[in-house]
A protein has these predicted regions:
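Sec-dependent signal peptide recognition
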Residues: 21-29
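N-terminal secretory signal peptides that target proteins for export/translocation
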Residues: 1-18
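A short, Trp-centered hydrophobic/proline-enriched beta-strand micro-motif
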Residues: 49-69
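Gly/Pro-enriched, hydrophobic low-complexity segments
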Residues: 130-208
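Cleaved targeting-peptide boundary
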Residues: 39-46
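An acidic-aromatic
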Residues: 73-120, 182
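Flexible, surface-exposed loop/linker segments and immediately adjacent secondary-structure boundaries
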Residues: 107-143
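N-terminal signal peptide c-region/cleavage motif recognized by signal peptidases
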Residues: 35-36
């Protein structure tokens, strides 16, 4: 009987050790999962607060398609975004459902729906508070990079959005499709502008 018990005890100890190790692994897994979710929630909250403070925002931008560069100024107010390109002189005005392209040199304008147009990304990035919640992101001391594949008008677009970290600043957007790559960089951020009432009108004064 004593010999049998001596055989049982090591087996029991091994079993308990395995159970203890398994329990420890489960605890570590949930700690990592909780920490990851907490970090993600903190980043989401930080970005959402940043987006909410863009109602009187302006910045300079440089847009590139790989072969040419364009410069201009961007303005945001009351759920509308205005992009003024310097050369040629033209404006892109965007709201949630519609947009207008204005050629100031020719004094022409053309309206379009933003729902299936890549320019809708401007609205989503700058004015949709929940847009970033479904993104995968990487964070370090210098930057936060959000990345996601989205479908616009049946085309897959790889979207990357770069924020400077500490302080949080939107620095660059890269949208890549099968045949095109567009990058837009932002500088000279201003959050406390006073805008003229007509700046966000879909009809320029000379066409009214």
């Amino acid at each position: 009987m004593e010999s049998f018990q001596k055989q049982i005890m090591p087996a029991k100890d091994k079993f308990l050790k395995k159970q203890s190790n398994l329990f420890l692994l489960v605890i570590i897994f949930f700690i990592i999962l909780f920490s990851t979710n907490t970090i993600a929630e903190q980043v989401d909250s930080k970005v959402i607060n940043y987006i909410k403070n863009l109602n009187f925002f302006s910045s300079k931008f440089i847009q590139s398609n790989g072969t040419s560069l364009e410069e201009g100024n961007m303005y945001i107010k009351d759920a509308k975004i205005r992009l003024d390109y310097l050369s040629p002189d033209r404006t892109l005005l965007i709201s949630k459902k519609k947009g207008v392209y204005i050629n100031h040199e020719l004094k022409e304008q053309s309206f379009f729906s933003t729902e299936k147009n890549i320019v809708r990304l401007f609205y989503d990035i700058f004015l949709d508070y929940s847009f970033f919640s479904s993104f995968v992101f990487k964070e370090n001391n210098k930057e936060i990079v959000f990345e996601k594949k989205i479908i616009i008008d049946s085309k897959i677009t790889n979207l990357k959005i770069f924020f400077e970290n500490k302080p949080l600043l939107l620095r660059k957007i890269i949208a890549k499709t099968e045949n095109e790559l567009i990058s837009i960089s932002f500088s000279e951020h201003n959050y406390n502008n006073t805008f003229d009432e007509n700046l966000f009108s879909f009809v320029p004064m000379y066409l009214d």
